């Protein structure tokens, strides 16, 4: 059963404008399925197969000639030199919708695209399924269940999460680590994955992360860079205003799919996660993820930031609009926030003044309502509607 992706219209728009479209994202996020659903008559080449990747490196022109256009080329990071040959073909015939590329190593791919396909390629980052996409497809999944299960498509068409997640980590994450970083101590890397999951939505401290894993801080940086490049984690950068001097400058670490984070952290039921001390952090990661998904699916590259002073006041998420106005968002794992939950929002408003145009507490409320100071307590769905309207 096909679950409609919110990114479908953006892919079609890009294909009408650019000769090439690149869809990046975590492994198994649905990149190939999306393209094959939209373009069922396109020929298909997977560089995930070693023989095809070797042919792309050693005889690229012969390989490309064997696949009629339009063509979907999967996991193009295994032969980045192929991008130069695609560029040459595009320059010889500047027609839209010729090449559809996917890749699971974002940084290396973007470097190749900027060098070879600048101005010729539309780029979309595809996240795992949002809860909104699942609800739109008739999956009546509650927020607590989604928090535990996450959005990898296979899990919503019958896969057993107790079997799927261990296989995913072993097949994809560990393989990428072996191929890219030549790591041989996989149990050590698995401890690192667990440590990251336990720190989701926390300010990143490489020394603490390294110490708890038993590795050097530089190794922690290298491994985290790989997870970021693989779209497994995101680093949420701090917002620096003009009036506050002493701000936390380190980024926050967010595991982008809460289901993967729950598995890595050792939770084995949604009730266990909901009752744990980490529920609030997972909720914040969920809210960040839903906002990031909506933005990516719309082609919106506005950064999602956070704000925290050295003395304590914090705002979980800050979005700066093009005109310089700010949307300040707190994430609370509760149904009924009250005036005691707005301290961070008021501190940011005190620091930034009239630039703060909207304050929201995103919570588990069934119906949005306004607190006495003008802050709105809203559901995730309502928050997404408010952000989309601006």
Protein language model regions, located:
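Short glycine-rich substrate-engagement loop in P-loop NTPases that contacts/grips substrate
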Residues: 42-70
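Short regulatory helix/loop adjacent to the ATP-binding pocket of P-loop NTPases
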Residues: 107-122, 139
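A short beta-strand-to-loop transition that corresponds to the Sensor-1 phosphate-sensing loop
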Residues: 102-106, 112, 128-129, 362-365
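Conserved P-loop NTPase "ATPase switch" module shared by AAA+ and STAND
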Residues: 67-82
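Interdomain hinge/linker elements that couple catalytic modules in large macromolecular machines
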Residues: 127-282, 286-297, 302-303, 309
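A cross-kingdom feature that marks ATP-driven nucleic-acid transaction machinery
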Residues: 1-4, 8-9, 13-15, 20-21, ...
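Loop/turn-to-beta-strand initiation segments
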Residues: 19, 68-70, 95-100
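Conserved catalytic/switch belt of AAA+ P-loop NTPases
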Residues: 83-107, 114-116
